[in-house]
């Protein structure tokens, strides 16, 4: 959100939680209003939770804001995949001033996404893995908590490999792809050896 704040002509953030509605407004990256009074807090009758962010790209930062709608759709879909059971709503204003809305939600996250992609014509049922572990990037660095979520299956008709890190799709795979491939190869090798093959 910080990068969006500084690259926006304006950005309005509204958060509903704990029976309140919190609002904060930015222009050109700066908070609108005195620092201590910038955050508006209003009681909310609803048990609503969630966040709404409305912003406009700053034309001094972006020389062209003609971004294809499919890019937004794909980005929202990918966020729904890695944030299970969270609904992302895309609202696009048409030339007539009317808004079209499209929701993206995968209740079981990556598991539902894989099933959507492969359908029912698979060789093996999708296998879902979720684990919390400790890990480190190098020997000289401290350990940290790692949450791993994976889903895989073999299909007769569809091939896909996607990798995500910190809710971001890694178009070119990167280190998480190398780690996943290495771990899968190691696990399959260990299983084959345990079967005496």
What does each model-found stretch correspond to?
Residues 1-118:
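GHKL-type ATPase core
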Residues 90-197:
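GHKL/Bergerat-fold ATPase module in large chromosome/replication-associated machines
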